[in-house]
Regions:
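N-terminal secretory signal peptides that target proteins for export/translocation
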Residues: 1-16
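The canonical Cys-X-X-Cys-His
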Residues: 47-57
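Outer-membrane beta-barrel "beta-signal"
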Residues: 49, 420, 446-460
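Outer membrane beta-barrel
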Residues: 61-62, 94-110, 115-249, 265-270, ...
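Transmembrane beta-barrel outer-membrane domains
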Residues: 94-96, 121-125, 153-157, 218-222, ...
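Outer-membrane beta-barrel translocator domains and adjoining extracellular loop/strand segments
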Residues: 111-117, 154-159, 191-196, 250-260, ...
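Detector for outer-membrane/organellar transmembrane beta-barrel domains
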Residues: 281-414, 426
Length: 460
């Protein structure tokens, strides 16, 4: 604990010395151009500022959740249209092409360098994303993202959600329903307490991270394709379900499975249930979600691994009129994973078949208008020790085969404009891959991975 406390000033001083000139230059660029009004495609489509849908991107307001529920199709702008006739199809097409761009540049420094690499890494860019995001037709809209990764030096599909949405009445109450095509379990969700859009909303791709993680906690992201349906009744009860298959973008088709640790056999069903209530100054959601998948590692036939994840989550947003309508957000989740790794065990990749993982996280965030936000978060993972599944290795390994990791996250973001985010984030580890000291068997401590991360993000 003492090492974690001491690390912050030392890393921060070095980070500020290197990166401060970049942030000063960015601030001057913004300050000297007060007429700049670059906004994402949803803002251009609706004529509304970013703050209508977001407390702070990607955190959705109740209005933003309704916009997503309705299929991203609300618009106040001109369209090219043609009425439906007996022998002609209808047309509703945005005059403006719904394209947006996100540009991220960042700096990362860990308390101790990673062996064989420099410390204090600047990525310019860290990534660049293109979004086809907006209304396609009267009931069809999209959030479709491709991202350039500087380390891989290529573009690839990122989070994508294409949906059909409509509404009716059921038992005299509002009934929303829709169909979603997406490539990441929970990317279709409306709240920020599930993995795809949960805190931290951004982070370093340079710093080490804990080895163990639940399947639903990002392990299938952009590696699957799914089709599902969702409903919201009376603006309170939300139900959703999606079935997924492995896709492996960039790999040969038909899929041979080679080189992929997860190859879904049949389909992997994902389910979601949530209850929400919204008043003038309060928004509360409590819910559960989960997934079940069977997989043949590195093959499409043979012995199977089985994963069953279930989770509980909540989100509470409180608008405080006495503080000029500043917002305080509370979010949390718990994921339980039960595994039967028969295939991995058969190939000597695990010491025994049955394992479990528990993942917990919680955070509280204060939004100062739409200009500043500060977040404090805690996270932890623990489960079945297995020195074969979690072997010893420098930096990424575990000396005792224990998957337990615990830590905290501090994040401060400043938006000089609603489409520009300047952030500083600190990650501290109390335990990493099972131990506080010499966790990898090569002399590295958990606090050695404590990280300062600086981000400049531009959205236009």
């Amino acid at each position: 604990m003492r090492n974690s406390t001491v690390a912050l000033p030392a890393i921060a001083k070095s980070s500020i010395k290197i990166f401060a000139p970049i942030f000063v230059a960015v601030w001057l660029l913004i300050a000297l151009k007060p007429d700049a009004h670059a906004v994402p495609s949803y803002s251009r489509q609706t004529g509304l500022p970013c703050a209508s849908c977001h407390f702070a991107p990607p955190e959705l307001t109740p209005f933003g959740r309704k916009f997503k529920l309705d299929g991203y199709v609300m618009t106040t702008k001109p369209e090219v249209s043609d009425d439906k006739k007996p022998h002609n199809a209808a047309l509703q097409l945005l005059e403006a092409f719904p394209l947006s761009v996100v540009f991220d540049t960042s700096f990362t420094e860990t308390k101790s360098p990673q062996a064989g690499g420099q410390n204090g890494n600047i990525e310019f860019p860290q990534d660049v994303s293109l979004f086809l995001a907006g209304k396609w037709a009267s009931h069809v809209g999209s959030f479709a993202q491709v991202t350039y990764d500087s380390q891989g030096d290529h573009f690839s599909w990122d989070n994508t959600d294409i949906r059909y949405a409509n509404s009716s009445q059921l038992f005299g109450k509002q009934f929303n329903y829709g169909i979603t095509l997406n490539n990441n379990p929970t990317v279709e969700d409306l709240w920020n307490s599930t993995p795809a859009w949960g805190f931290p909303f951004t982070g370093s791709d340079v710093a080490p991270g804990p080895t163990a993680g639940a399947l639903i906690n990002g392990a299938l992201a952009q590696d699957v394709a799914g089709v599902g349906a969702y409903t919201m009744w009376n603006e309170h009860i939300y139900l959703a379900g999606t079935i997924y298959r492995s896709e492996h973008i960039g790999a040969p088709q038909p899929n041979p499975g080679t080189g992929f640790p997860i190859n879904i056999r049949g389909v992997a069903p994902y389910w979601r249930v949530a209850y929400q209530t919204v008043t003038t100054n309060n928004s509360l959601e409590v819910g559960m979600y989960g997934i079940h998948a069977k997989s043949t590692p590195n093959a499409i036939t043979g012995p199977e691994d089985s994963f069953t994840d279930w989770a509980a989550d909540f989100q509470y947003d409180r608008t405080v009129p006495q503080l000029k309508n500043d917002v305080i957000s509370f979010r949390g989740s718990y994921i339980r994973e039960n595994d039967s790794l028969a295939a991995t065990f058969a190939t000597l990749g695990a010491g025994f078949p049955r394992h479990h993982l528990n993942t917990v996280q919680g955070n509280v965030e204060y939004h100062y208008g739409t200009k500043l936000s500060g977040t404090v978060g805690l996270f932890g993972v623990n489960g079945t020790p297995d020195p074969v599944l979690y072997p010893q290795a420098a930096i990424s390994g575990s000396a005792n085969g224990d998957p337990r990791s615990d830590g905290y996250l501090l994040n401060l973001s400043w938006w000089p404009q609603q489409n520009v985010d300047l952030a500083v984030q600190y990650t501290g580890y109390l335990r990493f891959n099972g131990l506080q000291t010499n966790y990898d068997g090569a002399g590295r401590n958990a606090s050695s991975n404590n990280t300062v991360y600086l981000l400049a993000r531009f959205v236009f």
